[in-house]
């Protein structure tokens, strides 16, 4: 059985741990608990192939900036997460997470994941953002960011309702099992 190491990164409180707990136990956890590395392992079937999916949680807080990369070696796929209702966490995909991941693992596939999908249409959440002159992140914005950072896929999910949750991990596995073809630059020799 093929083993795949999937590391989840992103700002603190975007829902990385909830994503993993909800996926592995089918239950949404209660209050917020900041993480320092938890590992989960799940045997799953994707496209008829059995896979041992090793899920590595990380702490997004700056205090762990020097410790976090210790979990990066031998990673097969990264999930870079941001909250759809936190524009700051979305901006940090470009400013922090993509550069950090690429620095340590230049060729590892990335899946960009927008979390807390259930809150994007939540009236109270929209109102709180509006007070700060902010709005939730839209699907096209997420897609554009994924293209900008060269992510294999852009996906949105809710750990609370589990909408889109299984797809995130299925696509992470597919990114490893069926990597997209590398576009070769055609070298043309021009004589003038």
From Swiss-Prot:
InterPro entries registered for this protein in UniProt: P-loop_NTPase (IPR027417), Small_GTP-bd (IPR005225), Small_GTPase (IPR001806), Small_GTPase_Rho (IPR003578)
Covalent link location (Glycyl lysine isopeptide (Lys-Gly) (interchain with G-Cter in ubiquitin)): 147, 166
Pfam families from the UniProt entry: Ras
Disease: Intellectual developmental disorder, autosomal dominant 48: A disorder characterized by significantly below average general intellectual functioning associated with impairments in adaptive behavior and manifested during the developmental period. MRD48 patients manifest global developmental delay and moderate to severe intellectual disability.
Modification (Microbial infection) O-AMP-threonine, positions: 35
Annotated catalysed reactions: GTP + H2O = GDP + phosphate + H(+)
Recorded coiled-coil stretches: none
Effect on the protein upon substituting residue 67 to A: Strongly reduced interaction with PLCB2
UniProt protein name: Ras-related C3 botulinum toxin substrate 1
Compartments (UniProt record): Cell membrane; Melanosome; Cytoplasm; Cell projection, Lamellipodium
PTM notes: GTP-bound active form is ubiquitinated at Lys-147 by HACE1, leading to its degradation by the proteasome.
Residues bearing attached sugar chains per UniProt: 32, 35
Impact upon substituting residue 35 to S: No interaction with PPP5C. Translocates to the plasma membrane; also
Extent of motif Polybasic region: 179-188
Propeptide feature ranges: 190-192
Cysteine methyl ester carried by residues: 189
Modified residues (Phosphoserine): 71
Activity: how regulated: Regulated by guanine nucleotide exchange factors (GEFs) which promote the exchange of bound GDP for free GTP, GTPase activating proteins (GAPs) which increase the GTP hydrolysis activity, and GDP dissociation inhibitors which inhibit the dissociation of the nucleotide from the GTPase. GTP hydrolysis is stimulated by ARHGAP30.
UniProt membrane topology term: Lipid-anchor
Name of the gene encoding the protein in the UniProt record: RAC1
